[in-house]
Amino acid sequence: INEGTRIRDKLRDGVENALRILGTAFIAHPGSSELRARIDSGALDSQQFYRQLLRLIYRFLFLMVAEERKLIVPEATAGGTSHTVYSRYYSVEQLRRRADKYFHGDDSTDLWQGLRQTFRLFRDDEVASSMGLSALNGELFGENACRDLEGAHCRNNELLRAIRELSVFRTDKGVPSRVNYAGLDVEDLGSVYEGLLEFHPVLRSSPPSFDLVTGSERKQTGSYYTPPDLVHELINSALVPVIEDRVSKAKDKEEKEKALLGLRVCDPASGSGHFMLAAARRIARELSIVREGESEPTPTVYREALRDVIRSCIYA
């Protein structure tokens, strides 16, 4: 547990550093005049700018997790042309490999332009299908999520610095170690989110820069992270009785499946999504048991059940 806590703390530090690097990189680039004009006019305030940066960081985190778990390209086509093209030219992993090398002084912006195309893969059905992928149709990769940032410029060296902050941490002995994103869970990303609630974004114009300072944003906005123990209790007290009631009233396998997929779990202020994912997992476990008829369903059946539950039952 202590080791996991240290890794989460290191990741949170890396996210904070990446936010500062990218925030300053975008507004300071000579080609980002439109972004600076929107900030100077008040059309884009510090909180709105910060939210776009957060979405960008969580795009990176999402893709790093998905790529390491080999979830981007369907298993049936893994190793094929689509997999090779995505891995070589569109993945965040190829940026992580670049960031492991010397990159200082690279003032080009082609890597950021390439990332914009990567983001299109996950929001545009036509573009995604051309690569054998599926668009996510979610807000994280939506056109408005990072609109001002996608229209701005970022130098390669600064982008790679930020990617390295997200990719590598130093152990207590000072040894560089790669973050194992395949092993991260929502609790880890939630811990990062919790730490970010403490900060207030600051934009400076001369010279253009972005910073995070400790503030009272959490108290003022009512933003709070739900700890794992409380999530566990909420699931057991509020959701499990409903699941058991629905299943007990169903007469056969088909009715049980329909009853479970008919559940609706809503959290308008889902934040990191910790509670919602825990709810989805609990319903999915019951659904996979119903489908397979075994108390310990296979991973494949569980994953399919989880996908169906998230599509049908979860609203956030």
Name each region found by the language model.
Residues 1-284, 313:
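Preference for the N-terminal adenyl/adenosyl cofactor-binding alpha/beta module
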Residues 247-259, 287-309:
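Short mixed-charge
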Residues 316:
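Conserved AAA+ ATPase "SRH/arginine-finger" region at the nucleotide-binding site
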